[in-house]
Amino acid sequence: MVNQTPTSHAPPGPQLDRIFAALADPTRRALIQRLDGVEELTISELARPLAMSLPAVMKHLDVLENAGLIARHKTGRSVQCRLTAGPMEDAMGWLARYQRFWTESLDRLAQALERQP
């Protein structure tokens, strides 16, 4: 049996690296989760349930914005944050290629085991 790995046209670029690095932190994942299902939240609204300072939350938001996962804009005196779909879709697409690879590999293994006496 030949070992077939997913074909890739190019290695993951720096943007994908930033996305996965941003998602690796539980606080940043919690911030994304808070933004899910709402149009926008202010930085204060995002920070309220977290046990950390506003400057610490803002650093996490900087990482998320740098990865393209959120967008911020100023409305009056407050800064609004919202999710952006594109980067998450890029990450999901990259992961989906490997999901297909592992699913096919495990299916082949199951078939080989079923043929065993």
Annotate each PLM feature.
Residues 48, 59, 66:
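Alpha-helical residues within the helix-turn-helix
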Residues 14, 59-62:
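Exposed, low-complexity/repetitive linear segments and helix-based recognition motifs
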Residues 14-55, 75-93:
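N-terminal helix-turn-helix DNA-binding core of bacterial DNA-binding proteins
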Residues 5-6, 61, 76:
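Residue-level detector of intrinsically disordered/flexible regions characterized by low predicted structural confidence
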Residues 1-15, 33-37, 89-117:
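Amphipathic alpha-helical dimerization/coiled-coil segments
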